[in-house]
From Swiss-Prot:
PANTHER family: LIPID II:GLYCINE GLYCYLTRANSFERASE. It comes from the Bacteria. One of its GO terms (molecular function) is aminoacyltransferase activity. Catalyzes the incorporation of amino acid(s) into the interchain peptide bridge of peptidoglycan, using aminoacyl-tRNA as amino acid donor. Belongs to the FemABX family. GO terms for biological process: cell wall organization; peptidoglycan biosynthetic process; regulation of cell shape. GO terms for cellular component: cytoplasm. This is Lipid II:glycine glycyltransferase. The keyword Cell wall biogenesis/degradation applies.
Length: 416
């Protein structure tokens, strides 16, 4: 096994074609991390000119100290059953990490637990410290240990049928409601950033500046690995559909009124009256929208990412308006179809815990992601290879305890 000097294109081609490859190991992803103080170096090993394993090493300085952390996010990309390859990658990574004054090498490979027994054994034998099998969104990990993934290598009907029953109904209703899903461009990021701001205010989280999303789009869009989707409500075509629905409902009511007014018919009349009422309310709302925003308004948006045959729902945002149109359901289905048409076989919804309690802060995420025909992808987790034991102990053990103590004292002082 030997060190190899390969191009970015060769690195990315290997990552995209390998079953353990991941978006975070693409060379262009490293470009997106520069804004937050990370820089990168790449390594590769192989034999007889054939690449056997690669790693994109991210480095970040420790505040006030002349040291760095070496982080191989969702790497190394290699066969974890092949100890010789792992040993060669670790040896090369240690060489580079020591050159960058790293106190540790942290990895969190895209290897699932049910296929990871040999990987765990090999990594431990090579000297890696396993961070344990904690909850998927544990704060002890940089990346989620668990994600929810939908297999999308199926027909449209099969895909919808794979969703949970109530979600199937919502998707079908969203398609009927007539919103328009657009694959947008860089200009659309302004709309997306505004929707993200609205989402953050509604759901109580801090949002990124538009430059963050521009950075991701600029780095990955050219190679087809980042796409922006927006959902628009255009009042005129939707109004036409609503008017047709109203006509059909009124005709149905007239037909029911001509029948014998038994209990069954009266119940049906009551149902149709409720439908007519809702349709009239919808018509009124859309008429007002046509006056104020004749070109329509954007209701939601998302970034869809790719790494070979894997696709990722990375960031999503939505307006507070016209939520009954279910724009997010329409968007998710269209993004899955787009991903499938562009070679993806899986659609990753991102991090989750496994069946959290209803009072957990992560319950809502899990509840949303579980209805899309997903399975739980549980990774083997995070591993550290320690290069500087005293500094590792300080950064990984002492500093977090001090931070928790400061927070505790601050809360007590505020309570006085």
């Amino acid at each position: 096994m030997e060190k190899m000097n390969i191009t970015n294109q060769q690195h990315d081609a290997f990552v995209k074609s390998h079953p353990n490859g991941d978006l975070l190991q693409l060379s262009k992803w490293a470009d997106t991390k520069k804004l937050t103080g990370w820089y990168s170096r790449r390594i590769a090993v192989g034999e007889n000119g054939q690449i056997k394993g690669v790693g994109q090493l991210l480095f970040k300085k420790i505040p006030k100290l002349p040291y760095t952390l070496c982080y191989v996010s969702r790497g190394f990309v290699a066969d974890y059953n092949n100890k010789e390859v792992l040993e060669a990658l670790l040896s090369y990574a240690k060489e580079v990490a020591k050159d960058e004054k790293s106190y540790a090498i942290k990895i969190d490979p895209d290897v699932e637990v049910d296929k990871g027994a040999e990987a765990l054994k090999n990594l431990r034998e090579l000297g890696f410290k396993h961070k344990g099998f904690k909850e998927g969104l544990s704060k002890d990990y940089i990346q989620p240990r668990m994600t929810m993934i939908t297999p999308i290598d199926k027909t449209d009907d099969e895909l919808v049928q794979s969703f949970e029953r109530r979600n199937r109904s919502k998707v079908r209703l969203a398609l009927k409601r007539g919103t328009k899903v657009e694959r947008s461009n860089r200009e659309g990021l302004k709309i997306f950033a505004n929707l993200m701001k609205i989402t953050g205010e509604r759901d109580g989280f801090l949002t990124r500046d538009i430059s963050y999303f521009e950075n991701i789009y600029d780095a990955l869009h050219e190679d087809g690995d980042a796409e922006l989707f927006l959902v628009k409500l255009e009042p005129k075509p939707v109004l036409d559909t609503v008017n047709q629905d109203l006509e059909a409902q009124l005709a149905e009511k007239e037909k029911l009124q001509s029948k014998k007014q038994d209990k069954k018919t009266l119940n049906k009349l009551n149902d149709i009256d409720n439908k007519i009422k809702k349709t009239n309310e919808l018509k009124s709302d859309l008429t007002e929208l046509e006056k104020s925003e004749p070109e329509g308004i954007y209701l939601s948006g998302a970034l869809l990412m790719f790494a070979g045959n894997k696709s990722y729902y990375l960031y999503g945002a939505s307006s507070n308006d016209y939520r009954d149109f279910l724009p997010n359901h329409h968007m998710q289905f269209e993004m899955m179809k787009y991903a499938r048409e562009h070679g993806a076989t899986t659609y990753d919804f991102g991090g989750t815990d496994n069946d959290p309690d209803k009072d957990s802060e992560h319950y809502g995420l899990w509840a949303f992601k579980r209805v899309w025909g997903t399975y739980l992808s549980e990774k083997i987790g995070e591993f550290d290879y320690v290069l500087n034991q005293p500094l590792y102990h300080l950064v990984e053990k002492v500093k977090p305890r001090l931070t928790k103590a400061k927070i505790k004292i601050s809360r007590k002082l505020k309570g006085k």
